A protein has these predicted regions:
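N-terminal active-site beta-alpha-beta segment that forms phosphate/nucleotide-binding
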Residues: 39-122
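Conserved phosphate- and dinucleotide-binding cores of soluble alpha/beta proteins
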Residues: 1-40, 111-283
C-alpha cells in the first residue's frame, strides 16, 4: 500500500569490500574531505597547462579584486579548475569557495571528486546551500559555457533532441552579482598549442559555441541587463563582456588571428571597440 512507504526505515550496513564503500569514485576514504583532518593545500597537484587552465587562470584574475569576505560558487567542468589555479597562486584561502553540493570554504575539487572540498570550513545540505544562493549570497560564480548568442543568452540545458537539464544553473545565476561563463571557444576535436606565451589553433573544433540564437535559454541576457549583473564570457582565445547594447569583444589571446580564429568562428558579430591582448602570463 502507498502508506507503507512512510513506514520504511534507513539502515546502516557494514560492507567489507573496500571497492563498494568508497567515499568518492577514486578513493576509499580521505579525512580531509570530511573535516576530520586538514592538509597543507600546497600538497595538492597543480593542473597541467592547457587551454582549459588558461580559461581558469583568466577567471581567477577576477578574484584578485574581490574582498576577503567574498563568496564564490564554482560549477562543474572548466570552472572546477578555478579553485586549483587560485590555490596554486596562493589566493585560494583568502576567499570562500563553495559548490552546490554543500561545501563551504576550503579548496573545491574537480573531476570525479567534484562536489567535495579539501579543508572545507563547513558543509550544509544542498537545499540549504541553494537557499543561500537564491537569496543573493554569492559575489561571483563561474559556470560552464556550451552555447552563447548575440543577446548574451546561454544554453547548457538542451541540444537538439537531447535534454541535459539545467540543474542548479538557473538558481545560481539569477541573483549573483558577477557571473562568469567559462568554456573553450569551439568544441569537437579542437586542438591547440600553447607555446612561448602564445596560443595557436592547430585544428579548429567542429562545433561552434557562439551561435546566432541558442537552442534553449538557460541564462537570459536580457534579465541580466535588467538587473545590472556583470557578465563575462571567458574562452581560451577571447573574452567577451555583456553591456547594455550587447556582447562586446574585449580581449583576444596573443598568437590568435582576430578574423580567422575568432570572428569567422562565430554565428554573430560581437561589438568591437577597444580589444586588448589577454595577459601573456596566462599562457
Amino acid at each position: 500500500a502507498a502508506s507503507d512507504v512512510y513506514k520504511r526505515q534507513d539502515y546502516i550496513v557494514q560492507v567489507d569490500d573496500e571497492t563498494k564503500r568508497q567515499q568518492s569514485f577514486d578513493c576509499e576514504y580521505d579525512p580531509s574531505l570530511t573535516g576530520e583532518t586538514t592538509i597543507p593545500v600546497k600538497a595538492l597537484d597543480p593542473a597541467p597547462l592547457n587551454a582549459k587552465k588558461v580559461i581558469a587562470r583568466r577567471a581567477a584574475l577576477l578574484l584578485l579584486n574581490m574582498s576577503n569576505e567574498a563568496v564564490i560558487n564554482l560549477g562543474i567542468g572548466i570552472p572546477e579548475l578555478v579553485s586549483s589555479v587560485a590555490n596554486e597562486e596562493g589566493i585560494g584561502d583568502s576567499l570562500t569557495m563553495t559548490v552546490e553540493a554543500g561545501a563551504i570554504g576550503g579548496v573545491p575539487l574537480g573531476g570525479v571528486r567534484f562536489g567535495a572540498s579539501v579543508n572545507a570550513e563547513a558543509y550544509m545540505d544542498q537545499a540549504t546551500q541553494f537557499d543561500f544562493y537564491d537569496g543573493g549570497g554569492l559575489d561571483l560564480t563561474c559556470l560552464g559555457l556550451a552555447e552563447c548568442d548575440k543577446d548574451g543568452n546561454i544554453n547548457v540545458s538542451k541540444f537538439g533532441t537531447r535534454i541535459a537539464g539545467c540543474g542548479g544553473f538557473v538558481n545560481i545565476t539569477q541573483n549573483t552579482k558577477n557571473v562568469v561563463f567559462c568554456g573553450t571557444f569551439t568544441t569537437g576535436k579542437l586542438r591547440e598549442e600553447i607555446k612561448d606565451g602564445e596560443l595557436h589553433i592547430t585544428q579548429e573544433g567542429k562545433v561552434k559555441k557562439f551561435v546566432p540564437e541558442v537552442g534553449h535559454i538557460t541564462f537570459s541576457g536580457n534579465y541580466a541587463r535588467k538587473h545590472k549583473q556583470h557578465v563575462l564570457y571567458i574562452t581560451e582565445r577571447a573574452v567577451f563582456e555583456m553591456k547594455e547594447d550587447g556582447v562586446h569583444l574585449t580581449e583576444i589571446a596573443p598568437g590568435v588571428d582576430l578574423q580567422k580564429d575568432v570572428l569567422d568562428q562565430m554565428g554573430f558579430k560581437p561589438i568591437i571597440d577597444d580589444v586588448k591582448l589577454m595577459p601573456a602570463f596566462l599562457f
